Amino acid sequence: MNESELKLQFGKPLQITPRLHIKQPTIKEIEKMDGKYEKYLSLLITQSRDIADVLWVKANIFYEDIKSEWLFFIKNCIVDGEAAPIYILKNDSYIQMNDAGLVINKEYTDALNYFFETDGIWFTSSITACGIQQLVLINAKEKHGIYYLDSNDKPLQINESVYNNMVDGLAKLNWIKKEYQFTKGGTKDATTYFLEMEYRKRIKKKKDRITISTIFSSLVAKGHRYKDVKKYPVYFFYESYFRLLKISEYENTMQALYNGCIDTKNHPINYEKIDWSSIIK
């Protein structure tokens, strides 16, 4: 994933493998989805640490005991999955596969198909690569209720490496930076105490403080044209918001400096940090 920032600002998809890319919608397209975008995004990027408090309080599962986020993801995919036969189409004949697993549930299928701009279904399978057995998701076509792979085409696959790239890519496109305060707890007892506190905060929290809607309003209030913001690719939309915060920080610092509110001798200004045209970290 070496996509330049400029390409992402221009709305280009994020390539994660030679054959798989992540779709980058505009804000107008997201609005038309009526909440499905946020739902699909959450399904694909949520990992054990993101719901560590829920896992501990509701299921008595400690997040550090989950050794593989990939297997955790697969487990969620196959809840209500379907044990359906998968066929290989060869010379106009359907031959049933022997090593096909479960067809993943509709929610995860829709999420993967949306972001990867694919269709059909995804099913689990165990393959051997470089002498190592791996669990993968394979994309199959669907016709008249029959799930099949075309013997003339190499099917799309998601393995653990592709999954990790997908999570990182979606976080990059949507400017999601994950921080976990409970990991600073030290001992397990201290950590679980923090998790229980986090859970209490979660159930009291009615809605997010900052949303796509509030960012949209902020950009318009700061002079971005309404009709232009609707056309912003999601990466540029968030980048514009965080750039706006850097500009505000710079303006506030300069105003305080002009009014003599900053003792620059004892508290020198880090101009590199407040440079609003610098790379946002």
Task: For each feature predicted by the language model, list its residue ranges.
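Long, intrinsically disordered, low-complexity Ser/Thr/Pro-rich regulatory/activation regions
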Residues: 257-281
